[in-house]
Regions:
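Alpha-helical substrate-recognition element adjacent to the catalytic core
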Residues: 1-133, 228
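C-terminal cap/substrate-recognition subdomain and adjoining C-terminal extension
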Residues: 73, 79-102, 106-273
Length: 273
């Protein structure tokens, strides 16, 4: 599971195309969004989505889904990201493991869908607009903020990927019936906004990794305060620390899976006598 902005891509996804289209600087747009959120006591994610609609309307620019998807083509990624997913999936397959990749992001789903890496994801959980009959964005359809990101970890755990299906998500399910056990999960994010998911991984036996562009005390605190298992530069190239550690985690998962299966088979044999 991956965050997106500053985890896979090098900055906030709106910075590449959307904000320049408004003839604004990144600082101007995010200053307006942040001040709006603070003055109105708004969820910061809803504040930026409102700012996108407001700024577009004020400039008589339609905010169309297809335009946002098109903006995904200009998103820039950290080194190694583009071939990371196939490389890791192929590695897992050699060990008998089926590796799946998911995005859980507070960024825009439409922009992520337009990127060249979107085809690698089984599901993309991110913010999304509702559009009117003319195709203009009018309302937030999905808001993924820092704390409700954990909802999507549970969805992956149970295999309930439809965000409109809350009934099955909340239905009791035996642990051995859950599609992806927590112990078989890795969450990769870039900072404090990912802490709820990172701590959830550590609490339930999964793994969390913080990536960074420049090491500072904040990312080191995540490790020292046991909020993450590992910290690495955001370089996804082969044989980097990040690459080798993720592969080692998958090796461990494969061995644990074999031991679990052996335990299960022995119990079945005893019960079948």
């Amino acid at each position: 599971m991956y965050d997106f902005d500053r985890t896979l891509c090098t900055k906030d996804m709106q910075d590449y195309s959307f904000i320049p289209r408004l003839n604004m600087t990144e600082d101007e747009f995010w200053k307006f969004s942040n001040e709006l959120g603070q003055s109105e006591h708004m969820d910061s994610i809803l504040a930026y989505m409102y700012a996108m609609v407001k700024m577009s309307r004020e400039r008589n620019m339609p905010l169309l889904r297809n335009d946002l998807v098109e903006m995904g083509k200009n998103v820039e990624f950290f080194d190694g990201v583009k071939d990371w997913f196939k490389r890791i999936s192929d590695f897992g397959e050699k060990l008998g493991m089926q590796v799946e990749h998911y995005v859980i992001s507070s960024g825009m789903k439409e922009i992520i869908e337009g990127t060249e890496i979107s085809k690698n994801f089984k599901s993309i959980f991110a913010c999304e607009f509702l559009y009117d009959e003319n195709g203009n964005a009018v309302w937030p359809k999905t808001d993924v903020n820092y704390t409700n990101k954990t909802q999507f970890v549970y969805r992956i755990n149970k295999g309930v990927l439809d965000v409109a299906n809350d009934v099955d998500l909340n239905r009791s399910m035996p642990e051995d019936s859950k599609r992806v056990p927590f112990c078989n999960m890795i969450y990769i994010g870039d900072g404090l906004s990912d802490v709820p998911c990172m701590k959830m991984m550590k609490a339930y036996g999964g793994y969390s990794i913080a990536v960074y562009r420049k090491k500072d005390s904040k990312v080191e605190d995540l490790l020292m305060k046991d909020r993450v298992d590992f910290i690495y530069p955001a370089d996804y190239s082969e044989n980097t620390g990040l690459d080798l550690t993720v592969k080692n985690i998958i090796r461990k998962m494969a061995v644990c899976g074999l031991l679990y299966d052996e335990n299960h088979e022995q119990k079945k044999e005893i019960l079948g006598r």
